[in-house]
Amino acid sequence: MRAYAEWEEQELLFLSLPHSNSDWEPYLEEILAGYEELVAAIVPFEKVVLICPDEANFARFKKFKNVEFVKLDTDDTWIRDYGMIDVCTKDGVKSYDFKFNAWGGKFKSSKDDAINLELAKIYKTKLEPVDMILEGGSVEFNGDGVLLTTTKCLLNENRNKALSKEQIEEKLKNLFGLKRIIWLENGFIKGDDTDSHIDTLARFIKPDTIAYASCEDESDEHFDELKRMEDELKKTGFKLLALPLPKPKFYDGKRLGCTYTNFIFINGALIVPTYNDENDEKVLNLLAQALPDRKIIGVNSLVFVRQNGSLHCSSQNRYKRS
């Protein structure tokens, strides 16, 4: 049993489209245009499956090759957190269906929590239900037995209140074949409502390297926490790559949760959120230097973050079946 590193070979990428019966309704056209840009970046490399209850929203994507459409009802778009999670076993790929309660009961979630059963039928998936709340954005694997995660999310009483830290660790080790769990106690992104998901803060980009959100502006509200997180990461023994936060961005008076670590690995490429910021190009260049065998593609994510998520949150990878 082994958890995949996200850069391993994939079969397709799931995306769950915004629709009018969701929080995206006030700026639906803007966010669908954002998804159009995202799909355009992915399809030269990998198949995309678009999920939506409203078939009218599929129309703009019909021009793309390498896209499949699935009509299913959803509460929200953030399929990273309610989508099935693949693991590698001696008998091939297996997928876990964890319970989903919308980040500790913050929003409605019954449709999202039910979607894996339907997708498993369509994509003939060996699906194993797991009696535990876990979101894909809260766990980060290096493919070699190491999990990176945060105490603020996984140990939050709004997830698995009945389980102790030791019980959660035991479950995770058994489910994902882990040798080591790295718990980060510091780190947050303003505008994130997941209780500090790891995919907003620190990500493996190689088995031995972690890219992380950094802040050099002492006047920024992130400075102290991200410095403490950086100190924690320096003690892990992994190589580190600092990705500086963009300058503060606001919408409707609210600071947006802009972070460059919310990137997506696909076959042959890395899709990176950008924010019309001077650091966009700097971060894309840093990642290109670190991953010379991959095409690094920026996709504007300023509309995505209005609803507190970005590109990685919006997607879920399905790994190659033999």
Describe each region flagged by the PLM:
Residues 1-322:
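The feature marks the mature, well-folded catalytic cores of soluble enzymes
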